[in-house]
From Swiss-Prot:
Function: Catalyzes the covalent attachment of ubiquitin to other proteins. Plays a role in transcription regulation by catalyzing the monoubiquitination of histone H2B to form H2BK123ub1. H2BK123ub1 gives a specific tag for epigenetic transcriptional activation and is also a prerequisite for H3K4me and H3K79me formation. Also involved in postreplication repair of UV-damaged DNA, in N-end rule-dependent protein degradation and in sporulation.
Main location: cytoplasm
EC number(s) per entry: 2.3.2.23
Taxonomy, superkingdom: Eukaryota
Family according to the record: Belongs to the ubiquitin-conjugating enzyme family.
Organism: Neurospora crassa (strain ATCC 24698 / 74-OR23-1A / CBS 708.71 / DSM 1257 / FGSC 987)
Top-rank EC class of the record's enzyme: transferase
Protein name per Swiss-Prot or TrEMBL: Ubiquitin-conjugating enzyme E2 2
UniProt keyword list: ATP-binding, Chromatin regulator, Cytoplasm, DNA damage, DNA repair, Nucleotide-binding, Nucleus, Sporulation, Transcription, Transcription regulation, Transferase, Ubl conjugation pathway
One MF term in the entry's GO annotations: ubiquitin conjugating enzyme activity
Pfam families, alphabetized: UQ_con
Catalytic reaction equation(s): S-ubiquitinyl-[E1 ubiquitin-activating enzyme]-L-cysteine + [E2 ubiquitin-conjugating enzyme]-L-cysteine = [E1 ubiquitin-activating enzyme]-L-cysteine + S-ubiquitinyl-[E2 ubiquitin-conjugating enzyme]-L-cysteine
Designated gene of the protein: mus-8
Residues forming coiled coils: none
Length: 151
């Protein structure tokens, strides 16, 4: 069945293949274009450097008018990531625009890794360490980077 959402997701997939953003990749799971597996590589010169973080993206038939739900599968220690792996990111909620595609969502998440919003923490411990004890925060992040290699 070809719906507007599915057609748009196939365009997003084609863009990911022909013009992939640096450090992110994503593709639909076999036989279901509405669910995607994604990987974000931790940005260079950040505590997340060399991490390989896996995510899953779920799209509803209202996409692109409704944002996808995005969840880290890899363990993540970050002020804007809940223990469940779900993200607190404005473009996935109140600042969503149908102009965003899969590449834009993933690059926004990649940017968020080193530029957290501590004013709206999903992980209070990570937020407090980020603000008050950056050395310990970096240590905890590096632990998740090392775990990401085992996924």
């Amino acid at each position: 069945m070809s719906t507007a959402a599915r057609r748009r997701l196939m365009r997003d997939f084609k863009r990911m293949q022909t013009d992939p953003p640096a450090g992110v990749s994503a593709s639909p799971v076999p036989d279901n274009v509405m669910t995607w597996n994604a990987v974000i590589i931790g940005p260079a010169d950040t505590p997340f450097e060399d991490g390989t973080f896996r995510l899953v993206m779920h799209f509803e038939e209202q996409y692109p008018n409704k944002p996808p739900s995005v969840k880290f599968i890899s363990e993540m220690f970050h002020p804007n990531v809940y223990a469940t792996g779900e993200l607190c990111l404005d473009i996935l909620q109140n600042r969503w625009s149908p102009t965003y595609d899969v590449a834009a969502v993933l690059t926004s998440i990649q940017s968020l890794l080193n530029d957290p919003n501590t004013g709206s923490p999903a992980n209070v411990e990570a937020s407090n360490l980020y603000k008050d004890n950056r050395k310990e925060y970096h240590k905890r992040v590096r632990e998740t980077v090392e775990k990401s290699w085992e996924d």
